[in-house]
Design a protein with these regions (language model features):
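Conserved donor-binding loop and adjoining core beta-sheet/short helix segment
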Residues: 37-104, 216-230
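Active-site rim helix/loop that mediates acceptor-substrate recognition in acyltransferases
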Residues: 30, 36-62, 183-212, 217
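Conserved GNAT acetyl-CoA-binding A-motif
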Residues: 113-125, 256-267
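Short amphipathic alpha-helix that is part of the acyltransferase structural core
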Residues: 2-47, 157-186
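Conserved active-site alpha-helix within GNAT-family acetyltransferase domains
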Residues: 126-144, 245, 270-288
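Conserved beta-strand-loop-alpha-helix junction that forms the acyl-donor binding cleft
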Residues: 93, 121-131, 265-276, 293-298
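Conserved acetyl-CoA-binding loop-helix of GNAT-fold acetyltransferases
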Residues: 98-111, 137, 234, 240-253, ...
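Glycine/small-residue-rich hydrophobic helix-like segments
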Residues: 190-257
Length: 298
């Protein structure tokens, strides 16, 4: 790894700096495709919200790089004890010595990882070539490509008028089984999907008598004008009937029923070509071509 020149210092982030320094820095750089990190947001307000929901808290997981008193880099992580994984928020660096700063941040952050973390993940726009170079240097290997797709409100004129039912307790068990079949290592379990249901998180389903054919899990963040489809699943025996399209169309109508919501996003694996065609056929546009990379700990 590249040595860090003496003029740089690495520091923890204070509680006050999370909102006044860290969030604006991450969001500003994240708006550039060549710097984009999938786990970071593009506005300070959304970044503050994301940082506020992290576990452990950012003061325990982030390090900042300074040249004198100028902030030039940041890196931290969020974790999931069940998956044993840490997602890296960065590296975000604004300096010509990009790789030296990134290497120093990575070296400083790794000792902060909790014991339950067995694997690290980077998630970056494929145009972020410096992050890719760092991933290779740090021993990460590719975990697959995906697309972040965007759909704006004015595209609803071309969306069919499809409806889906709200999930009822009669199909709770079937949903958990289907979710595990299709997403065995998802960051959300079927039980967690059920627990997340509230005014802003909706599970919509298609059924045939007592049988669950498919579901979509969508959420809205009206305070930020955004919606997001987290999961779309159709039982294998029910495929080829256009049910995925119906579910996504119904989710779009639910999300845009909120006047505050102006745009929605979803993520699709690049290798899942039928799903990508479905989303693009409804009007979604590719915003970020993304790459995940992982490295085991130890």
């Amino acid at each position: 790894m590249s040595p860090l020149p003496e003029k740089f210092t690495l520091r923890p982030v204070s509680p006050e700096q999370v909102t006044t320094v860290l969030a604006p820095f991450l969001a500003r750089l994240n708006r550039e495709p060549e710097r984009h990190i999938g786990y970071c947001d593009d506005t300070p307000e959304m970044m503050v919200d994301t940082l506020g929901r992290m576990s452990p808290v950012p003061v325990d997981t982030f390090r900042l790089a300074f040249e004198g008193e100028r902030l030039v880099g940041a890196l931290g992580f969020d974790t999931d004890a069940r998956l044993g994984r840490a997602w890296l928020f960065g590296p975000q660096v604004e300096h010509e010595a990009w790789h030296a700063v990134a290497d120093a941040l990575f070296t400083a952050v790794c000792p902060l990882l909790p014991e339950h973390v067995r694997e690290l993940e980077l998630y970056y726009d494929v145009r972020n070539t410096r992050c890719h170079e760092a991933a290779v240097r740090w021993g990460f290997t590719s975990a697959g490509d995906s697309y972040v797709l965007r759909f704006e409100r004015d595209g609803m004129t071309g969306v069919p008028h499809e409806t889906a039912e709200s999930l009822t307790p009669a199909h709770h068990d079937a949903l958990k089984v289907l979710h595990h079949e299709l997403w065995p290592v998802s960051w959300l379990t079927g039980e967690q999907l059920l627990e997340k249901q509230d005014e802003n998180h909706r599970l919509l389903v298609l059924t045939e008598g007592p049988e669950l054919l498919g579901y979509v899990f969508a959420k809205v963040q009206p305070e930020f004008g955004e919606g997001f489809i987290e999961h779309v699943a159709v039982a294998e025996r029910a495929r080829g009937r256009g049910l995925g399209r119906k579910l996504v169309a119904a989710a779009l109508r639910w999300m845009f029923s909120w006047d505050e919501v102006k745009v929605t996003h979803l993520v699709a694996r690049a290798e899942n070509e039928p799903a990508v065609r479905l989303y693009r056929g409804l009007g979604y546009q590719v915003l970020h071509p993304m790459r995940a990379a992982r490295r085991p700990i130890g």
